[in-house]
Amino acid sequence: MNRNAISLFSSSGIGDLGLKANNINTVIACELLKGRMDLFHCNYPTTKCFQGDIWKLKNSIIDYYRTTYNEPPFLILATPPCQGMSSNGMGKMLSDYRKGLRPKMDERNRLIIPAIDIIQALQPEWVILENVSNMVNTLIYDENNILTNIIDYIKTSLGDNYFGNPVVVDAVDYGVPQHRKRLITVLT
């Protein structure tokens, strides 16, 4: 059985440790920042690494997977940047907006769009999305420049192909000695 995964917004691969512990092989990773991608590659030397802007790399990721593997991935893990969604990030963003230093909408929140494009193209059996709990309240402009809730965008884009709902979990409930609330969405 194919137990291949694709990791989007991979950072150094911390999220992929859980996949590895469950015999799921991350075969492709994508990360914007070179230092993080280099560290990911050290941690997972056999993984094909795509470093750079996911908007520019999404077709290369899709093409590479399709030409290398003859079946859909088992799982896609996507952990897009949270700065525009977190309460700390929002406070700084709104402060900078009031000072005229940045636009009101954080473009990083739209990075879910190329991730969804990859999911739609490759049709994995499972999808895991992880982010801050405030993701449920985040608005983005979709491809048609229509303002929409990011969770509604995900559900509408994936349609009837996937079932699942976002759930807020707190790390303290899983043995971690601190409160750290995250929004986890598992789709199948």
Mark where each language-model region is.
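Short loop/turn motifs at secondary-structure junctions
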Residues: 4, 23-25, 45, 71-72, ...
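Conserved SAM/SAH-binding loop
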Residues: 52-57, 169-173
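Generic enzyme active-site microenvironment
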Residues: 29, 51, 77, 128-129
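Conserved N-terminal glycine/acidic-rich loop preference
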Residues: 15, 57-63, 72
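Class I S-adenosyl-L-methionine
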Residues: 63-75, 83-188
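SAM cofactor-binding core of SAM-dependent methyltransferases
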Residues: 5-56
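A generic secondary-structure signal
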Residues: 18, 39, 43, 60, ...
